[in-house]
């Protein structure tokens, strides 16, 4: 096979990034946007010795699992990778991905996984689920100001104010801002020259409260005719907070370091279950509140709290899981590296009248071992103990030093919430080699139409 060869291929499998996989005489091709069962014509773009990457030129025979994407930009945009696959098959793919990693990397037998894994938790309506969206502003090739999303692996903006994953209110907000910019001849930011005013617009929406936040990220200290823009935006139903964030750095980082209120509050509020959260422009908050409630419900069920337990919640963010757990535990300790998130966590505990949650700023892999060592010094002959430990790390998973301390603290149960089943499998292998057994596994579709999947597992001390 050589570059620019055009081939006919049947798609037999799906890769971890959602790409179709087909074979020609044992030579493997990865083809973006192809679906298992498709017969396609594809042009080879990059040819290695045993495999290559090809671009789909046309679908000769569509798969029975192929659907028409809801969004007309699904193929160009980098936001959704698998919108062309039926939702039932998306769920199948994600479940298989999780269990495959647990078997291949974790070394767990298919028989065990079949016995302990519950079906993936899907969505009733797998669209318009995101409570947060960040829209870049720029110019198209005709010099017209546009907003939308970046095309995959580029910084070219695809003009689209109606994302199928975002809430419908986004469209009215973006069109209001675009027409204001046109009226006052305001320039969007240009990455190449570093000139222009508006860089991004961040929109947050409270699914329960219906409150809206708009944060305008600008390449200046203020917006000319700002009062007019505020007047237009505050007419939109649900508008609660309008802020600006100044970012004058030549960087890909979206937000500036701080923000200033132009109108309304500095935050919006929303609920997960019965817990109320304050969310600022810089807060980390799960983007899919419908599935988050199910995800945390599972974590709580697996923790199996009776009311007298001491619980550690590592990588706790703004205390979302901690506050859920605190309703049913004696004491919860939350650890998070981002100081702003811990401020939010403490504030959220106060708002909800929760007094049995204590939060620490720092790296989980430093705070927990540090606490364990300090406890041993202060209580000779004793060791720090936790009844339950909950972890929800980033994609890189947990460092071994942290896993080691977790094992030393001898919790009866460990609940691991993961956004990367490969690092989850690696960490479970360590824990199950050091006195724990895998009891339950369940995937949760937190990011429909994309390849990402969350997993919740329960480990029990042998």
Regions found by a protein language model. Give the residues of each.
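A short, glycine/Asx- and small/polar-enriched loop/turn
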Residues: 127-131, 210, 451-452
């Amino acid at each position: 096979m050589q570059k620019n060869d055009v081939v006919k291929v049947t798609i037999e499998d799906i890769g971890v990034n959602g790409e179709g996989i087909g074979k020609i005489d044992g030579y493997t091709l990865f083809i973006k946007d192809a679906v298992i069962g498709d017969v396609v014509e594809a042009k080879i773009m990059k040819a290695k010795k045993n495999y290559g990457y090809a671009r789909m030129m046309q679908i000769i025979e569509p798969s029975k699992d192929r659907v028409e994407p809801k969004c007309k930009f699904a193929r160009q945009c980098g936001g959704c990778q698998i919108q062309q696959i039926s939702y039932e098959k998306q769920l199948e793919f994600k479940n298989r991905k999780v269990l495959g990693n647990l078997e291949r990397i974790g070394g767990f037998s298919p028989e065990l996984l079949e016995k302990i894994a519950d079906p993936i938790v899907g969505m009733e309506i797998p669209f318009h689920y995101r409570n947060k969206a960040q829209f870049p502003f720029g110019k198209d090739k005709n010099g017209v100001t546009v907003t939308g999303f970046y095309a995959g692996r580029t910084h070219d903006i695809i003009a689209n104010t109606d994302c199928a994953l975002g809430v419908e209110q986004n469209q009215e907000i973006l069109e209001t801002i675009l027409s204001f910019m046109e009226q006052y001849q305001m320039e969007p930011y240009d990455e190449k020259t570093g000139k222009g005013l508006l860089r991004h617009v961040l929109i947050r929406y409270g699914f329960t409260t219906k409150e809206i936040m708009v944060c305008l990220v600008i390449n200046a200290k203020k917006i000319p005719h700002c009062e007019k823009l505020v007047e237009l935006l505050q007419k939109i139903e649900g508008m609660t907070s309008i802020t600006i964030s100044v970012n004058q750095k030549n960087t890909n980082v979206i937000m500036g370091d701080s923000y200033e209120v132009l109108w309304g509050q500095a935050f919006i509020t929303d609920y997960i279950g019965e817990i109320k959260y304050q969310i600022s422009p810089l807060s980390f908050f799960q983007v899919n509140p419908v599935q988050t409630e199910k995800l945390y419900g599972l974590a709580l069920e697996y923790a199996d709290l009776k009311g007298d337990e001491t619980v550690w919640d590592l990588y706790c963010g703004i205390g979302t899981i901690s506050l859920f757990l605190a309703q049913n535990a004696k004491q919860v300790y939350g650890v998070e590296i981002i100081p702003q998130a811990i401020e939010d966590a403490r504030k959220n505990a106060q708002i909800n009248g929760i007094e049995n949650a204590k939060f620490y700023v720092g790296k989980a892999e430093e705070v927990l071992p540090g606490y364990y060592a300090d406890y041993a010094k202060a209580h000779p002959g004793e060791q720090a103990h936790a009844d339950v430990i909950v972890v929800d790390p980033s994609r890189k998973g947990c460092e071994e030093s942290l896993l080691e301390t977790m094992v030393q603290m001898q919790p009866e149960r460990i609940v691991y919430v993961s956004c990367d089943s490969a690092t989850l499998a690696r960490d479970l292998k360590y824990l199950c080699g050091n006195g724990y057994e895998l009891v339950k596994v369940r995937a949760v579709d937190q990011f429909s139409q994309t390849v990402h999947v969350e997993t919740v597992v329960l480990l029990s001390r042998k």
